[in-house]
């Protein structure tokens, strides 16, 4: 009996360790970063719609809701959307898969944001009733015109030192490191990359919430 109980506790501890701790958890999103070993499957999520950001080049398999398994070749910085019933990611290409899964807690929205507020060089990756996802690249020593973000998750693929000038003239310095996964409140600003490295960020803006931090 004691041996069985010890084995049971070991199993529980292994299961707990296999589920990554959230990098971000608030009333809008749960964001988890995970490394999936070759031939393994990502940990169970919360059964929520999500945007998944890939952090390395890999081959993965997934099963869409009610469909057959499909194989995808993904690149670092690629993002896919999955509904609540879409299957988990499997590292099917012989290499590990590093990813950030951003679960969306809102009920969704019929609003279409499009490119509203975005800087001209931002690349809109996709938008639906749950999220707007876009790619940000700011070369070292360059500036962006004034633009506006909603509340968002930022997944940093190349870190940099940024300086933001707000509409009231105040200045905020922001240091992003490669690998950061952070929550940022909505803001309007002019951005300047004052560092020596290019900034590359994926922004995931959840929908279905009233404006505010």
Predicted features and spans:
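Glycine- and acidic-residue-biased ligand/ion/polar-headgroup-sensing regions
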Residues: 47-65, 149-168
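Ligand-binding loop in jelly-roll beta-barrel domains
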Residues: 57, 84-105, 159, 186-209
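Bacterial N-terminal signal peptides
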Residues: 6-15
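Short beta-strand His + acidic residue motifs that chelate non-heme Fe in jelly-roll/DSBH
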Residues: 42-44, 61-62, 82, 86-93, ...
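Short acidic-glycine-tyrosine-enriched beta hairpin
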Residues: 66-84, 170-186
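Positively charged n-region of N-terminal signal peptides that target proteins for export
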Residues: 1-4
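A short glycine-rich, His/Asp/Glu-containing loop-to-beta-strand
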Residues: 21-55, 117-144, 151-154, 204
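Surface-exposed beta-loop interaction hotspot
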Residues: 88-137
């Amino acid at each position: 009996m004691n041996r069985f109980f010890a084995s049971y506790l070991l199993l529980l501890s292994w299961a707990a360790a296999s589920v990554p701790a959230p990098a971000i958890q608030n009333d809008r999103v749960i964001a988890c970063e995970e490394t999936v070993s070759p031939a393994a499957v990502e940990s169970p999520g919360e059964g929520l719609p999500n945007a998944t950001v890939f952090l390395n080049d890999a081959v993965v398999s997934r099963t869409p809701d009610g469909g057959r398994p499909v194989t995808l070749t993904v690149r670092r910085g690629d993002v896919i959307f999955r509904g609540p019933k879409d299957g988990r990611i499997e590292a099917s290409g012989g290499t590990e898969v590093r990813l950030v899964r951003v679960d969306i807690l809102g009920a969704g929205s019929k609003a279409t944001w499009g490119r509203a507020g975005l800087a001209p060089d931002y690349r809109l990756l996709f938008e639906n009733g749950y999220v707007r996802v876009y790619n940000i690249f700011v070369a070292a020593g360059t500036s962006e015109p004034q633009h506006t973000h909603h509340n968002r998750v930022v997944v940093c693929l190349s870190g940099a030192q940024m300086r933001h000038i707000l509409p009231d003239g105040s200045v905020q310095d922001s240091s992003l490191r490669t690998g950061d996964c952070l929550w940022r409140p909505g803001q309007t600003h002019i951005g300047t990359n004052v560092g020596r490295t290019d900034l590359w960020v994926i922004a995931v803006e959840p929908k279905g919430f009233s404006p505010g931090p």
